[in-house]
């Protein structure tokens, strides 16, 4: 049984109690759903902020072909970017990538950019762990021997290698990422999406091509709408050049 009705009721209740500024949604991208219908739905429920999340997979579990995620996101980006409705939702990662491309480094988060990841999880038994999305890497992958009743939160960064890796995940990148022209924007993507049993986190993201294509596409759209004097100060990105580097 789906939980859509319960979620929608909870969303409406949140709006009623806390106001429209807190009417925010997380949405894992499903490329089998019509992106036009998805965008229209978020407008219909008057969502204030929508965060489109990439499906959580690793190099060992991913089934999405290169380009499929971009093709889906491109449709929504075009709808959103051309939408003149001032009440349209703010959609991540679009606003984040635009901010990063314009030099606003504060737009980074655990998915992209060049900020440190400071989120921890306290399990129901009090255990201190890194974010639960890293459990996609394997059973018990985020387990620690640390507990809030016996430890300080910062202890995890001393005693747990995974926590340190996650904290610095946009700085500890594979060689390919460190040489990429988009490294400052992409930041290597989400840590879990780089994982493989064979090489650990020493990989590019499973969504590397899609991220590169999306970043270039967004930059080109924004570039084309800038005044000529600003265009002269900015180098337009070309996906084919990035692709050649990625696949070399």
Regions found by a protein language model. Give the residues of each.
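Long, K/E/R/D-enriched contiguous segments that form extended
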Residues: 36-108
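Short, small/polar residue-rich loop motifs at catalytic or cofactor-binding pockets
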Residues: 112-116
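Radical SAM/AdoMet-radical enzyme domain recognition
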Residues: 1-55
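Radical SAM enzyme core and accessory elements
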Residues: 125-127, 136-139, 148, 171-248
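Short, solvent-exposed loop/turn segments at secondary-structure junctions
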Residues: 30-32, 57-59, 96-99, 127, ...
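C-terminal accessory region of radical SAM enzymes
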Residues: 69-101, 133-178
């Amino acid at each position: 049984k789906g939980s859509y009705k319960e979620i929608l009721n909870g969303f409406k209740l949140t709006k009623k109690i806390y106001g429209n500024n807190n009417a925010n949604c997380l949405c894992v991208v499903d490329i089998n759903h019509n992106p036009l219908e998805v965008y229209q739905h978020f407008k219909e429920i008057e969502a204030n902020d929508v965060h489109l999340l990439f499906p959580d997979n690793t190099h060992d579990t991913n089934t999405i072909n290169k380009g499929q995620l971009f093709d889906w996101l491109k449709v929504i980006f075009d709808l959103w970017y051309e939408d003149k409705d001032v009440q349209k939702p703010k959609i991540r990662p679009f606003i984040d990538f635009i901010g990063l491309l314009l030099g606003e480094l504060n737009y980074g988060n655990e998915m992209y950019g060049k900020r440190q990841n400071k989120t921890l999880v306290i399990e129901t038994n009090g255990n201190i762990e890194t974010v639960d999305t890293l459990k996609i890497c394997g059973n018990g992958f985020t387990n620690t021997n640390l507990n809030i009743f016996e430890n300080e939160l910062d202890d995890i960064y001393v005693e747990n290698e995974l926590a340190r890796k996650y904290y610095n995940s946009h700085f500890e990148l594979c060689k390919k990422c460190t040489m990429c022209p988009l490294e400052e924007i992409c930041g290597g993507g989400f840590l879990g999406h780089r994982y493989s049993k064979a090489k650990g986190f020493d990989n590019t993201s499973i969504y590397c091509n899609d991220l590169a294509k999306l970043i270039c596409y967004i930059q080109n759209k924004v570039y084309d709408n800038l005044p000529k004097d600003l265009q002269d100060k900015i180098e337009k990105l070309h996906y084919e050049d990035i692709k050649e580097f990625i696949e070399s």
